[in-house]
Amino acid sequence: MAVLAALLRGGARSRSPLLRRLVQEIRYVERSYVSKPTLKEVVIVSATRTPIGSFLGSLSLLPTTKLGSIAMQGAIEKAGIPKEEVKEAYMGNVLQGGEGQAPARQAVLGAGLPISTPRTTINKVCASGMKAIMMASQSLMCGHQDVMVAGGMESMSNVPYVMNRGSTPYGGVKLEDLIVKDGLTDVYNKIHMGSCAENTAKKLNIARDEQDAYAINSYTRSKAAWEAGKFGNEVIPVTVTVKGQPDVVVKEDEEYKRVDFSKVPKLKTVFQKENGTITAANASTLNDGAAALVLMTAGAAKRLNVTPLARIVAFADAAVEPIDFPIAPVHAVSMVLKDVGLKKEDIAMWEVNEAFSLVVLANIKMLEIDPQKVNINGGAVSLGHPIGMSGARIVGHLTHALKQGEYGLASICNGGGGASAMLIQKL
């Protein structure tokens, strides 16, 4: 090293071409190392959600943006910070038709945040809520902001029907349901998402009775979780005001109570009449709800004297053929585990969104993970699936359900063949 140092101190003319090249490379490496940025640690300091309402049920009088406002306000109050500390917000929302301009902006102002608070509405279909958390985390990691709110919201009860613009054709007009058109249809194969799931069931040889059994287990787990108070730290009550009537306070998810197990094996299949496997019982339902998390850098948490609940460890997106969307989480999860050097055995709890029972069974089968660690308190089949909310809901639930030091991995598929996954660690 001393000889090399002496050579480096020598004049340029005394160096051979090879040595000059070596000097340049060493200096380049040194500059690169010194200037390499360090990402900030991002923590979750609160995670709340509304109860999930059934389609045209208890929350149907509230628009998407109002549900978003309630979830945001609840998360900020739980965090115990002034609203002025929130510097930006991202909210997932899929079915935006008829909601008015900039739904996330409406939610932000409805929650009482300052007029100067920037906001962005995220649409990654069912993964929208999780993607909002991912994008907020990236902004915090790079130091662009230090306190943010992120989550997702959806009122499927309030999604309108639409008709094409133009002259009225002979025979009348045709109305289309935007829930189906913009939320539940594979635009590439021109089929319902359920038909895509049937394709996966056939490929992986996952029978109807397996899916029915999984659905019954989901309902059983959700009921047990509510009775044991497992959702107490995340669900905030929602007051619904009806003119001329007493206010109604909604405190619990509505969907898990609406099941008759004796009818589950008798239901007709919905998407494939012959040899089909998917029914109304083993698929998720149409629902209303919102979830929000307050995220900040570890430095901001210290500055604000806030105790973090969990830290964001890693996240990833993946994509496959659109028709194969049910297995896309397999790839996103694998990317996350590879990035952080963990094995599936290191994960204490898994949340795999139950768009269909088939989705969870397919991911358990392909990832070879322990079913007893997956969706231990139920999932979208029994709790409900407001599509813009669900990705945020499962991250928020892990935040509360994990024990100190444990890792939890949430994943969710989305239309078009995509998926998102996020790894957190309880603090």
Swiss-Prot record:
UniProt-listed Gene3D superfamilies: 3.40.47.10
UniProt KW keywords: Acetylation, Acyltransferase, Fatty acid metabolism, Lipid metabolism, Metal-binding, Mitochondrion, Potassium, Transferase, Transit peptide
Post-translational modification remark: Succinylation at Lys-268, adjacent to a coenzyme A binding site. Desuccinylated by SIRT5.
Residues the record lists as N6-succinyllysine modifications: K66, K78, K174, K181, K190, K202, K223, K230, K243, K263, K266, K268
Residues of the active site: C126, C413
Domain of life: Eukaryota
InterPro entries: Thiolase, Thiolase-like, Thiolase_acyl_enz_int_AS, Thiolase_AS, Thiolase_C, Thiolase_CS, Thiolase_N
Pathway annotation from the record: Lipid metabolism; fatty acid beta-oxidation
Catalyzed reaction equations: 2 acetyl-CoA = acetoacetyl-CoA + CoA; propanoyl-CoA + acetyl-CoA = 2-methyl-3-oxobutanoyl-CoA + CoA
Record: residues binding K(+): Y219, A280, A281, A283, V381
Free-text activity regulation comment from the record: Activated by potassium ions, but not sodium ions.
GO term, biological process aspect, one: fatty acid beta-oxidation
Transit peptide endpoints, chain numbering: 1-33
UniProt-listed Enzyme Commission number(s): 2.3.1.9
Binding-site list for CoA: Y219, R258, V259, D260, K263, S284
Gene Ontology CC terms, in alphabetical order: mitochondrion
In-chain residues carrying the UniProt-annotated modification N6-acetyllysine: K66, K174, K181, K190, K202, K223, K230, K251, K257, K263, K273, K338
GO terms of molecular function: acetyl-CoA C-acetyltransferase activity; metal ion binding
SS bond list: none
Site annotation Increases nucleophilicity of active site Cys: residues: H385
Cellular compartments annotated: Mitochondrion
Function noted in UniProt: This is one of the enzymes that catalyzes the last step of the mitochondrial beta-oxidation pathway, an aerobic process breaking down fatty acids into acetyl-CoA. Using free coenzyme A/CoA, catalyzes the thiolytic cleavage of medium- to long-chain 3-oxoacyl-CoAs into acetyl-CoA and a fatty acyl-CoA shortened by two carbon atoms. The activity of the enzyme is reversible and it can also catalyze the condensation of two acetyl-CoA molecules into acetoacetyl-CoA. Thereby, it plays a major role in ketone body metabolism.
Family: Belongs to the thiolase-like superfamily. Thiolase family.
Subunit structure: Homotetramer.
Protein name: Acetyl-CoA acetyltransferase, mitochondrial
Source species of the chain: Macaca fascicularis (Crab-eating macaque)
Encoding gene, per UniProt annotation: ACAT1
